Amino acid sequence: MARYDAILCDLGDVLFTWSPPANHTLPLNTLRSVLSSSTWFEYEKGRISQQTCYDRVGRELSISPVDIRKAIEESCASLRCDSGLVSFLRELKDSTGGALRIFAMSNISQPDYDALRSVGDMDWSIFDDIFTSFAAGARKPDLKFYRYALLQANLEPSRTIFIDDKLENVLSARSQGLHGLVYRESKELKQSLLSLFGDPIQRGQRFLKENAGRLVSMCGGIAIQENFAQLLILEMTNDR
């Protein structure tokens, strides 16, 4: 039996990236202040409306609510999914014969979620379910949100992998018994997941075959021409 049978994955800055245009309505630092405000957090929890959020944040940061709306719309328009990572997760799921379930867990308001769902190149069918902060009434790193997702999906924490780009969110997941991975870049995440789900023996054998004739010893990036490692590999594999 595989050690893990579920993945809880963040959406923004993991499966989706955004890049505001150079002539963005609000400077990037100002936009980040909007998105990290306590009022915005209440909006993501579904406790206030979109217009109420824009009005309050505008007063708090001395910004026009109209400019906030335009900046959010521009950011949503720039959203792109990491199709390579999505395809990788699809292949990983298929390789388990359906035993692996994949869920999304995102801090997001309902209007922004609706905008996210309109991104055309995303394969939403990869998810068995999607958990949002506006539906849960809580947001990461609040433990209430994790417990909500675990209960709704009937997940065993020790058999669930949690992926997020924010360390504080991963630490909260780990406190609930999940195996947390901090997302930094797609290639690293793929390698981590292969290590967790793949057969290490098969992976090692595949590496030997793919690199046959090039299995030299390396030290500090320098190839060392010696025979011991070659003879050891030959003895263990009986394969030239």
Model-derived features with residue positions:
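Non-catalytic pre-domain segments flanking phosphatase-related domains
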Residues: 1-9, 199-211, 215-220, 227-228
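Active-site neighborhood of HAD-like aspartate-dependent phosphohydrolases
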Residues: 2-37, 41
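Short, solvent-exposed loop/turn segments at secondary-structure junctions
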Residues: 14-15, 20-22, 107-111, 136-138, ...
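A metal-dependent, Asp-based hydrolase signature
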Residues: 41-73, 228
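Substrate-recognition "cap/lid" segment bordering the active-site pocket of phosphatases
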Residues: 110-160
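Acidic, divalent-metal-coordinating active-site segment for phosphoryl/phosphodiester hydrolysis
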Residues: 145, 165-178
